[in-house]
Amino acid sequence: MNVLRISKFLFLLLMSINGVGSVLAQTCSPPLGFVDTPHPTIAGTEELVSHTEEIIIDRPLAEVLKDLDRPLKDTIHKTSSLPGVSGEHMLTNGTFGVPGSRRLTCLTDGSTLEEEVLQREQTRNSFRFRYVVWNYTSEAARPILYGVGDFHDSDLGDGRTRIVWTYSFMLKQERFPGDMGGFGRFLFRVGFLDRQYADMMRATLSGTKTNVER
């Protein structure tokens, strides 16, 4: 085990997600040299590193879904260790939300990423929204090939709704820590996903609950 590599990875990860040298993105547009490429093929769950958070909102599903109309920058909550969203730029016609729609998202540290909707299904009692994120420009995300977000909203039938949000990452196999296989995925989980990223997920769900229950 190369302890020096592990220590360096965790140090750079923490420095990057804390916004060292960050620049506030005033507008959202494709950066110089940007190439809009198809998203990577999504692997099976056993190859991904995942984390799940859930929350109960004291409102029926129909009211919870109205919150989807909020701008992304007002939905994803910035934490002390992760940047927030500063803007969005559509890469396909129409609005973001239908399967196949794609956008560029700008973050408050000056970096960008791409998102595409993979799945959107709704019944009277449930809602599922699944999307892929890739083409990260943040230094902190260099080890990441792509991420997959998956929301499952369920009407509990008593005026409450359960939201379950799972976020999964595929690491680049040729870069550290992905090149260390299962142990590298473990390092990524305990050093980032179950800590700073989980904090962001909880803050976002809490913000949704507060907004919907007003």
Segments the model singles out, each with a brief description of its role:
Residues 58-62, 118-127, 152-162, 210-214:
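A short, structured loop/turn motif at beta-sheet edges
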Residues 60-71, 75, 103, 117, ...:
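Hydrophobic pocket/interface hotspot
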Residues 76, 86-146, 199, 203-214:
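Glycine-rich portal/gate segments that line the openings of hydrophobic small-molecule binding cavities
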Residues 48-56, 102, 112, 148, ...:
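Intrinsic-disorder/low-complexity, polar/charged segments enriched in Ser/Thr/Lys/Arg/Asp/Glu/Gln
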Residues 1-6:
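N-terminal secretory signal peptides that target proteins for export/translocation
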Residues 8-19:
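Bacterial N-terminal signal peptides
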Residues 25-95:
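Hydrophobic ligand-binding cavity/cleft-lining segments
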Residues 133-195:
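Beta-strand/loop substructures that line and gate deep hydrophobic ligand-binding cavities in soluble
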